[in-house]
Swiss-Prot record:
UniProt keywords, alphabetically: 4Fe-4S, DNA replication, DNA-binding, DNA-directed DNA polymerase, Exonuclease, Hydrolase, Iron, Iron-sulfur, Metal-binding, Nuclease, Nucleotidyltransferase, Nucleus, Transferase, Zinc, Zinc-finger
Assigned EC number: 2.7.7.7, 3.1.11.-
Subcellular location: Nucleus; Nucleus, Nucleoplasm
Domain of life according to the entry: Eukaryota
CDD domains, per database record: DNA_polB_delta_exo, POLBc_delta
PROSITE patterns: DNA_POLYMERASE_B (PS00116)
Record motif CysB motif, residues: 1046-1064
Regulation: Inhibited by KCL. Also inhibited by carbonyldiphosphonate, aphidicolin and N-ethylmaleimide (NEM).
Protein name: DNA polymerase delta catalytic subunit
Miscellaneous note of the record: In eukaryotes there are five DNA polymerases: alpha, beta, gamma, delta, and epsilon which are responsible for different reactions of DNA synthesis.
GO MF term set: 3'-5'-DNA exonuclease activity; 4 iron, 4 sulfur cluster binding; DNA binding; DNA-directed DNA polymerase activity; nucleotide binding; zinc ion binding
Length: 1092
């Protein structure tokens, strides 16, 4: 519903049938809905049976019937989408502990025929390692097992699971420590296998703090791999990766049915049991890169709130739920319906399911979810609004069985609060609901993780990615539509259906599910973990897999923030200026991964401080077998030991090369998307390995690696600069001496002094090959682009026309300039864009200066639309050290209306208003709509001095020099200002309003208070009347155009516009013109009847 949408949006696809210009009713989304396949079957109401299991419903909703399977004769293949574990009882004939409870892994998935599968995997036990004390021998294992077992069981508080066995096995093994090179001789470690995942932490804690065996002390023995999640441990050891295909060979699995023991626990069509060492996990390449037709349910709810109060689940009813279900790989949703409270007029292309009672509607919807059996649940802000609201509302109304929305019959879906914090996403309050076997895939969450946008409302996102606007209904208006008739409820249903359809459009456009699925396959973690966890789990999973094959184990590291820092990447000091000649750009291909591979940088190759001499004596390690990095760290060369990280990176980049080659020959559009998602996931994964080593609060930080990588990067940038400038000289026969004008992390910009794009590109390619030949393989410098012209403003701030071929430019590329910054008003971005367009594309500096002057004049005279002045900032926390404008405004809005006030994690829109001199900016922030409605004057000086001046001077100083400020920010165009009189605040409440003459604006003399003109202007009454009527007519035409535009967006030219989309500039224009029109009508009415 709209209320949750500070996150809200549209859905407007490409209609399949041509639009009739005379057909006002059926446009855009409505036409698209009607044009879907089987639309004629959809326009009907269905009756549904009762109960959470096996109800009689539409066949269209059900999955295809499963085949008759015989485990002794058939293999079972399915793509798993979710991996989780639970505590169950041992199954006779399965490995592992034989007295319960035991951990069982559940894999949920889909077959190629579209049947849902629940696979119980038995016998896998959690374990960890500790260093073996020197006196510990093989014969001590059994004694340690019994002693530790007793300690762990005694440590259990309230043994409600009746655990009788905690430590299953103790073994003496030989492994290599991943951290640091100590030769190839394996060390002795004790492997401790326990019955339940929670006993890993308990056992390692007891070993550290208590006396387990009197004759041997374990307290100083370091623990290894005791911080690995059980699901990840299982996937690593069984070679399962996220979203890959699992095959159960005939004769090695059991099927559950109504006669089996144990009985089925899930709602899946096929439920099976298998031992952890009896199934085949296929690598997701070749034939096994295919994708099953898993079901995605996108839904949206509408609530009937009270005026001025955001809906509350205990009070405000759910009135509509719209649903769209699509199979992955198909373009159209095959299920389209809307559940409504009270009668609703039919909608072509959608089932309308009407209900008399809210409890009945919620009951039927939960039954619908169980029947459709979706694999993925999506929508917009469903985690923080739709799911919690539905569950809380159903609980309040005591709707029986509603909360059983997952695939396990006896597990309720419950709401859990969580605080998410990461460098990538900031700090956000989040709610999480469990749906065993179904993956919640909130589109808003995906966008917050992956895209930096000015606004995250569904409408803003829709416009950004799909170039479509949509009607946005405020939550206070929804109740009026619900309380109307079946036609107003139909309008609401269309709006609700759009908001369910749009996430599917955006998921397809952004390839979000395919990309995340491929990332899960590449990194080896479950799909849901990619959404709910940070970056480190992805690298950790890959590192564990590679370490397992080589006999390495990973020490447990307690996360502690460290003050120790390493020097970052080099930035060559920029030679600022406006370059009218072509500037060649040379980029290092995958710079940091290449450095790690070329110089064998890894945990396993690091020579720790103080061990060099020991290694020289014990391992005969020669000086020429060790490489000293520019950061003064030492690593053994690959001839001594090839590092794990370089091997991981090599396999990732080789797999990416294969995927890109396959992409070149693949013709199937969906397979192309999968391959493109795969190569992107492989690229991101390779680049994140370096970040894993540098994360100080992480699983395995190693500043020696990350510091060495950036140190090598710095020397390579400097070396590239020296090579280019020493080789490309007039003395060597070239046109001019080349100059490196800027270098940043992994690229250098070179001015070869040539005039043509062709020659600049030719020299760029030649220089890339020349410099690459000087570096260790696989470090490679590539020529990618030419900027022509190029505006170099400062470090990490530049703009230019981006050419990859000489005939035409690809785009205007900007970095660090206010065109791409989100914490400025759109006025800044639009002005910067227009200036850069005039400077770079039109090459008209004088025109750019004139345009800037005009915009500044418009700003000072109050001619800029308020939508261009809105600044947005994220409410990341409420306890900033200094007072912040958006935080103070959020507090002010909370006092006005707690329901609609911004919450933690939201982006807060505000404008800066005029106030007394020296008033701090945080006190001048105000809600844009409040400003419009109360004619609060804007602080134009703030926008000029704090928002526009610095960006403008940065762009124009390289062109105008020291005169830039006096030319742009001072002069004739800044002398005229318009001041708006506020209706609120200040002295407005104490002043008496007096009438003034409509002609000369002077106060009316005594005796003329009711007249429209003073005696001096009265002779010109006819002329002045015509002027006021003309002004009114202009405003009416403007309002009519804006109104019609909004009607077209809402797809009906006959209904009132009720949209309140604040991300749409027309919304503010419409509000302002409406107010101006009201004022102008009052001015005209002062003339009275035109009898004169």
């Amino acid at each position: 519903m709209d209320g949750k949408r500070k996150f809200n949006g549209t859905s407007n696809g490409h209609a399949k049938k041509p639009r009739n210009p005379d057909d006002d009713e059926e446009m855009g989304f409505e036409a698209e809905l009607a044009a879907f396949e089987n639309s004629e079957d959809m326009d009907q109401t269905l009756l549904m049976g009762d109960g959470p299991e096996n109800q009689t419903t539409s066949e269209r909703w059900s999955r295809p019937p499963p085949p008759e399977l015989d485990p002794s004769k058939h293999n079972l293949e399915f793509q798993q989408l979710d991996v989780e574990n639970y505590l169950g009882q041992p199954l006779p004939g399965m490995p592992g502990a034989q007295i319960g409870p035991v951990p069982v892994v559940r894999m949920f998935g889909v077959t190629m025929e579209g049947n849902s599968v629940c696979c119980h995997v038995h016998g896998f036990c959690p374990y960890f390692y500790i260093e073996a004390p020197s006196q510990f021998e093989e014969h001590h294992c059994e004694k340690l097992q019994k002693a530790l077992d007793q300690k762990v069981i005694a440590d259990i508080r309230n043994n409600k699971d009746n655990v009788q066995e905690a430590v299953l096995m103790v073994e003496l093994v030989e492994k290599l420590n991943i951290h640091g090179y100590n030769g190839d001789k394996k060390q002795r470690y004790i492997k401790i296998s326990v019955t339940l995942p929670r006993f890993v932490a308990a056992a390692s804690r007891l070993l550290k703090k208590e006396v387990i065996m009197s004759e041997i002390d374990f307290q100083d023995c370091r623990a290894f791999e005791n911080n690995i999640d059980f699901d990840i441990r299982f996937m690593v050891d069984t070679d399962v990766v996220g979203c890959n295909w699992i095959e159960l060979p005939m004769g090695h699995w059991r099927i559950r049915n109504s006669h089996s023991k144990p009985l089925p626990e899930s709602r899946c069509q096929i439920e099976v049991d298998v031992a952890f060492d009896r199934f085949i996990s296929h690598e997701p390449e070749g034939e096994w890169s295919k994708v099953a037709p898993f079901r995605i349910l996108s839904f949206d709810i509408e609530c009937a709130g009270r005026k001025g109060i955001f809906p509350e689940a205990k009070i405000d009813p759910v009135i509509q739920i719209a649903n769209m279900v699509i199979r992955q790989g198909e373009r159209e949703p095959f299920i389209r319906n809307v559940f409504t409270l009270n009668e609703c007029a039919p909608i072509i292309g959608s089932q309308v399911l009407c209900h008399d009672k809210e409890t009945q509607m919620l009951d039927k919807w939960s039954a619908f979810v169980r029947e459709v059996d979706p694999d993925i649940l999506t929508g917009y802000n469903i985690n923080n609004f739709d799911f919690p609201y539905l569950l809380n509302r159903a609980a309040h109304l005591k709707v029986r069985n509603f909360e059983y929305l997952g695939r396990i019959k006896n597990i309720r879906s419950v709401i859990k609060e969580q605080m998410l914090q990461s460098k990538q996403m900031g700090r956000r309050e989040n709610q999480y609901v469990n749906f065993e076997g179904r993956v919640p895939f909130d589109l808003l969450f995906v966008l917050l993780r992956d895209y930096k946008l000015r606004s995250y409302t569904l409408n803003a996102v829709s416009y950004h990615f799909l170039q479509e606007q949509k009607e946005d209904v405020h939550h206070s208006i929804i109740t009026d539509l619900q309380n109307g008739d079946e036609q107003t409820r139909r309008r609401l249903a269309m709006y609700c259906l759009k908001d369910a359809y749009l996430p599917l459009r955006l998921l397809e456009k952004l390839m979000a599910i395919v990309n995340y699925m491929e990332m899960a396959r590449v990194t080896g973690v479950p799909l849901e973990s990619l959404l709910t966890r940070g970056q480190q789990i992805k690298v950790l999973s890959q590192l564990l897999r590679k370490a397992k094959t080589k006999g390495f184990i990973m020490p447990s590291y307690t996360s502690q923030g460290s003050d120790e820092q390493y020097e970052g990447a080099t930035v060559i000091e920029p030679k600022r200026g406006y370059y009218a000649d072509p500037i060649s750009t040379l980029d290092f291909a995958s710079l940091y991964p290449s450095i790690m591979m070329a110089h064998n940088l890894c945990y396993t190759t690091l020579v720790l401080g103080g061990t060099r001499e020991k290694l020289r004596q014990q391992e005969n390690l020669q000086d020429d077998q060790v490489e000293r990095t520019p950061a003064n760290n030492y690593f053994v060369k690959s001839e001594v030991r090839r590092g794990l990280l370089p091997e991981i990176l090599e396999s990732l980049l080789a797999a990416r090369k294969r995927a890109k080659n396959d992409l070149k020959v693949e013709t199937d559009p969906f397979k192309r998307k999968v391959l493109d998602g795969r190569q992107l996931a492989l690229k991101i994964s390779a680049n994140s390995v370096y970040g894993f080593t540098g994360a100080q609060v992480g699983k395995l930080p190693c500043l020696e690696i990350s510091g060495s990588v950036t140190a090598y990067g710095r020397t390579m940038i400097e070396m590239t600069k020296n090579e280019v400038e020493s080789h490309y000289t007039q003395a060597n026969g070239y046109e001019n001496n080349a100059v490196v004008i800027y270098g940043d992390t992994d690229s250098v910009m070179v001015n070869f002094g040539v005039k043509t794009l062709e020659r600049s590109m030719e020299l760029g390619r030649e220089a890339a090959e020349l410099v690459s030949s000087k570096f260790v393989h696989p470090i490679k410098l590539e020529f990618e682009k030419v900027y022509y012209p190029y505006l170099l403003i400062n470090k990490k701030r530049y703009a230019g026309l981006y050419f990859t071929r000489p005939d035409t430019y690809d785009k205007m590329d900007c970095k660090g300039i206010e065109t791409v910054r989100r914490d400025n008003s759109p006025l800044v971005a639009n002005l910067m864009n227009s200036c850069l367009q005039k400077l770079l594309i039109e090459r008209d500096p004088d025109g750019a200066v004139a345009y800037v002057k005009q915009v500044i004049a418009d700003l000072l005279c109050n001619r800029i639309d308020i939508s261009h002045l809105v600044i947005t900032k994220e409410l990341a926390k409420t306890d900033y050290a200094a007072k912040q404008a958006h935080v103070e405004l959020a507090a002010k809005m909370k006092k006005r209306d707690p329901g609609t006030a911004p919450k933690l994690g939201d982006r807060v829109p505000y404008v800066i208003c005029a106030a007394a001199k020296n008033t701090p900016a945080y006190q001048k922030a105000e809600d844009p709509l409040y400003v419009l409605e109360n004619s609060v004057p804007i602080d134009a000086t703030y926008y000029l001095e704090q928002q526009l001046s610095k960006p403008l001077l940065r762009i124009f100083e390289p062109i105008l020099g020291d005169n830039a400020e006096s030319i742009l920010l001072k002069g004739e165009h800044t002398r005229t200002r318009t001041v708006v009189t506020s209706k609120v605040g200040g002295l407005a409440g104490f002043m008496t309003k007096k009438t003034s003459c409509l002609g000369c604006k002077s106060l009316m003399p005594k005796g003329y208070e009711q007249a429209c003109l003073c005696p001096h202007c009265e002779p010109r009454m006819s002329e002045l009347y015509q002027k006021e009527v003309g002004a009114k007519r202009e405003l009416e035409e403007t309002f009519s155009r804006l109104w019609t535009e909004c009607q077209r967006c809402q797809e009906s030219l006959h209904e009132e516009v009720i949209c309140s989309n604040r991300d749409c500039p027309i919304f503010y224009m419409r509000q302002k013109v409406r107010m101006d029109l009201d004022n102008q009508e009052k001015r005209v009415l002062r003339f009275g009847l035109a009898e004169w």
